[in-house]
């Protein structure tokens, strides 16, 4: 591990969290593979914050995510729970019993063709059980790019992807995957549907001890653990798993940052009554309990509402995506997540998770909203001031927390990241003697341009901003979502020439007054429920008094975001 890295341990809880996480780790892998590219700006993001180094039993160096993930039986497809890097057939064959053996062999899931192709380019598992890795620069990241004599790699299609492991291109450590065997991923029976079920999972000694052992394994090898980031499904029983996990982290690792990303999949329909009621209850219980035990909580969704009334999914001017496909939705959310988490992953002058949370969560405002412009609309020949001026007075990013349009709302504090803009475009290149069309055009650095723009948009608001040269790397299996973009993500008038390879992204975390209306609406929807009709949810471990307390907590939390409650009032 590189000296000085401020390590983060990621917990990934739930199946949609698995989709977002797969895209997230694929992006980290793509960035690692580009680390030796002379054209890349070196040293902006520190991979050791998220990754750990290790060595197999056969002495081969490995680089794997510092990750614990939990999912249900049947969710892994052909991915092995113990991973592939550390497998040893010689040890598997060492059986002490000398008597008669009966072998029960379970039929293997067919491997996704994309993963077969990926593994064949990464290396092979030889007959002696040793994983032979092909040569990779620095032992990290993706293999070298294909040449004219090598076959073109397969790209997974939407039709070929059933579960997140179908497109994960990163090797995991054997301590990463923890399966909840008592609940099923597929089918109508044995599902993890309710908050109370999720809470009870981590109350069982078996699963609690399993999680604690894995936490201790990763934490004890860290030099300076700054905290934990939790990617957690909010819509199902994993909201309860996440709440108990956050409580355990708060108790065991007091003083460390805990930032929770509450994930919700695409749009829903009125006709699915039970599923919608459960989603409402799970989201409400999850938000309140996660807020109690986290430093910061941010809902992430492409939906327009957290409540019972369906709203259309959000729109991106330069993206064409199918909101019913988790593969698409999770790719967009992972792009935003990789951008807004930049502050605590920087190599130089990082903002710790605790400091970031403290800045955004004053006066009890521990829930924040996220937004992103994907891609940031910079046309050939334009400068950053030109592009920012095109937004006018409108909020420049698309909302990603199901809190409605941000227009007319108030921001109390914000953390903003703009990445992937070439340094030559940071400032206006006006001909000497030409009067600047705006104050932004008179700025002498990109950082000054961004800071002044934010000050104009949100006067008297506590803002933290970061400007990075490093773009978001769009590498297979990222879906084809972009329209009218160059390979570097610049906005084009005509047809694009070649596939998009990277994009600039503008992302933000904001403590916003929009949460006042969102949380109050959530509480109103809950008061309309006849809980006698949803006895199955209550039977999973939730009492009527718990619902009454939930309503009080939601209303108190909503009041924190009343437009008049800020540092400047």
From Swiss-Prot:
Pfam families: Misat_Tub_SegII, Tubulin_3. The modification Phosphoserine is found at residues 41, 495. InterPro entries: DML1/Misato, DML1/Misato_tubulin, Misato_II_tubulin-like, Tubulin/FtsZ_GTPase_sf. GO terms for biological process: mitochondrion distribution; mitochondrion organization. GO terms for cellular component: mitochondrial outer membrane. It is found in: Mitochondrion outer membrane; Cytoplasm. Its main location: mitochondrion. CDD domains: misato. Keywords: Cytoplasm, Membrane, Mitochondrion, Mitochondrion outer membrane, Phosphoprotein. Involved in the regulation of mitochondrial distribution and morphology. Required for mitochondrial fusion and mitochondrial network formation. Belongs to the misato family. This is Protein misato homolog 1. It comes from Macaca fascicularis (Crab-eating macaque). The lineage of its organism: Eukaryota, Metazoa, Chordata, Craniata, Vertebrata.
